[in-house]
Amino acid sequence: MTSREDFLRRVRDALEALPNDERMVPVPRNYQRNAPVPSAEDQAEIVELFIDRLKHHGAQVHRVGADEIPGAIDSALRAHGARSALAPDGLPEHWLRRWELTGEHRVLDDQPHLSILDRERTDAVVTGCAGAVADAGTLILDGGPGQCRRDAAVLADCHICVVRVEQIDYSLPQVLDKLDPRRSITWFGGPTAMTDPEADSGKVGGVIEETERRLVVVIVG
């Protein structure tokens, strides 16, 4: 008998020696969930923590009012030198209108028929998000309105993500309660992206390539 087998045998023997009412120990699963709505002061601290974490990950962060979103997106796209941008279904049209109407700029709708090659050739993608985790500096996309599919988010050299203050929660458990588990969820927190080998026919099968990109987070509110 190996040391591992002996250890497991002793664990089984110890469990069998327990009274029936002590073998199953309930584990709480509602920690940090159903938290009360934070005060304005607490929410401000949560937002500042989120900004600090994003910057630590290497993201660029801009804080704007609701009417300043188009200008912030326009500035970010110009700073990146983008000539084309991918817009997911449900993204407010006016967010990109200012940038689209000046210069030779092109907005592509993120439709199912759009090929991987077309997505790769697009300079940037602009999205909203499903939620954000402040203590981890993590953004969450679930493919809902104004959010792109995972391959589009991963392949873009520049990702501009608009986050409303009320979408930022302190911890992951608080955000999980707001997500639809039936959706495909993408998590990211910085410029580094892991490309999906199944979505990129140009990569060697089974190889995941780490690529550097620009992440710009526009916080509204």
What annotation goes with each model-predicted range?
Residues 1-221:
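The feature marks the mature, well-folded catalytic cores of soluble enzymes
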